[in-house]
C-alpha cells in the first residue's frame, strides 16, 4: 500500500501520478466495523469498475484545528496503526491530508475540485453524516449535486448493532469508562495500545503508554501481550502513588520474555476475579516499587 501525505494547497506532483480510483472518505478513528463495512463496500465497487481503491483521511483530528484545542489529541488508532489496518483491508493507496487552518477554510466546492478531482476520484463513498469544506457546510447531498459532473457517489446508511450506531465516539466513551469487554462488538477486536518497557523483573513489567493512544482510566484490567509467537495473559494496573498517569504495571503468570522496548497491549476486560497467586505477586511488586 502506498501512503501519500499532502497539505493544502495540493501540489500537482501528487495529482499527476494519481490513478482513477474509488475513494472512501472519513477520519476513520478506530477503523471500527462501520468503517470496515464502508471500505469493503468501496472495495467491491472498485473491483466491479476495475479501479484502484484509495482512502482519504485527515490528520490531526479536525477539532484540534477548528476547536482551537491545543491539547495533543489521543486516538483509538493513531495514524501508524490506522495505516496498518487499511493495508489489511486491501487498500491500494492511503491519502493523508494535513488538516491545518488553510485546509479548514477550503470551500466545499474547492475540496471537490482540488482533492477529489485532483486524485482522479471516479466514485466517492462516504457515511450518511460525512461533512466537508469550511465549517462543515458540505454534506452527502452537496457531494452528490456538485460532484455529479465528475464522479458517482454512494452513501452508506447508518451502521448499527442492536439498534445503536457504531461510531468512534461510542468507542472512545467505552475506553474512557474502562468497559473493554464490550469493545469487540463494535471494533471487531480488542482495543490495543502501545507501550514502552521501562523495566522487567520476571513476571512484573513496568511500561509507559504511548501518548498517541487513548489511555484507560485508573483501574485493574485483564490484558494480553503477543511476543515471539506466544500469547501472554496478565493483569495491568496503576499504583496511585503520584506517578505519571501513563505508567502501568503489568503482571504475568510466567516470566515475560521480551526483546526490544515496544509492546502492544490488548485490553480485554476489567479484572474482577483474580487468583491468589496474582494478588500475591502484585503485593510483592507494589512493595518493591514503594521501597524504591
Which stretches of residues belong to each language-model region?
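Contiguous mid-protein beta-loop-alpha structural module that forms a pocket-lining wall or clamp
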Residues: 88-182
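Conserved beta-strand elements of the Class I
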Residues: 21-23, 54
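Phosphate/ribose-recognition catalytic cores of enzymes acting on nucleotide-derived substrates
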Residues: 199-292
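Core alpha/beta nucleotide-donor-binding catalytic domains of modification enzymes
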Residues: 37-97, 101-114
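Di-metal (Zn2+ and/or Mg2+/Mn2+) metal-binding site signature of metallo-dependent hydrolases
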Residues: 24-42
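Positively charged, low-complexity intrinsically disordered leader regions
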Residues: 1-21
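Residue-level signal for inorganic ion chemistry
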Residues: 32, 86, 124, 183, ...
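Glycine-rich, Lys/Arg-enriched anion-binding loops that position phosphate/diphosphate groups
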Residues: 148-234
Amino acid at each position: 500500500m502506498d501512503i501519500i501525505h499532502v497539505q493544502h494547497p495540493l501540489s500537482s506532483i501528487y495529482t499527476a501520478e494519481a490513478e482513477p480510483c474509488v475513494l472512501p472518505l472519513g477520519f476513520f478513528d478506530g477503523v471500527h466495523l462501520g468503517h470496515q463495512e464502508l471500505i469493503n463496500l468501496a472495495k467491491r465497487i472498485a473491483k466491479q469498475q476495475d479501479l484502484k481503491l484509495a482512502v482519504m483521511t485527515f490528520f490531526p483530528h479536525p477539532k484540534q484545528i477548528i476547536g482551537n484545542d491545543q491539547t495533543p489529541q489521543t486516538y483509538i488508532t493513531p495514524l501508524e496503526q490506522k495505516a496498518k489496518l487499511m493495508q489489511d483491508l486491501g487498500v491500494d493507496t492511503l491519502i493523508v491530508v494535513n488538516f491545518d487552518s488553510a485546509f479548514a477554510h477550503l470551500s466545499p466546492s474547492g475540496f471537490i475540485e482540488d482533492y477529489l478531482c485532483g486524485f482522479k476520484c471516479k466514485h466517492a463513498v462516504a457515511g450518511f453524516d460525512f461533512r466537508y469544506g469550511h465549517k462543515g457546510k458540505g454534506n452527502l447531498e452537496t457531494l452528490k449535486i456538485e460532484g455529479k459532473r465528475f464522479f458517482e457517489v454512494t452513501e452508506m446508511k447508518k451502521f448499527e448493532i442492536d439498534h445503536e450506531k457504531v461510531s468512534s465516539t461510542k468507542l472512545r466513551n467505552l475506553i474512557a469508562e474502562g468497559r473493554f469487554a464490550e469493545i469487540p462488538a463494535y471494533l471487531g477486536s480488542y482495543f490495543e495500545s502501545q507501550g514502552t518497557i521501562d523495566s522487567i523483573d520476571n513476571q512484573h513489567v513496568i511500561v509507559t503508554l504511548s501518548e498517541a493512544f487513548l489511555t484507560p482510566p485508573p483501574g485493574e484490567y485483564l490484558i494480553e501481550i503477543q511476543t515471539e509467537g506466544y500469547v501472554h495473559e496478565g493483569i495491568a494496573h496503576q499504583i496511585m502513588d503520584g506517578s505519571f498517569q501513563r505508567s502501568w504495571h503489568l503482571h504475568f503468570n510466567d516470566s515475560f520474555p521480551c526483546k526490544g522496548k515496544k509492546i502492544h497491549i490488548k485490553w480485554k476486560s476489567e479484572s474482577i476475579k483474580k487468583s491468589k497467586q496474582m494478588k500475591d505477586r502484585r503485593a510483592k511488586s507494589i512493595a518493591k516499587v514503594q521501597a524504591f
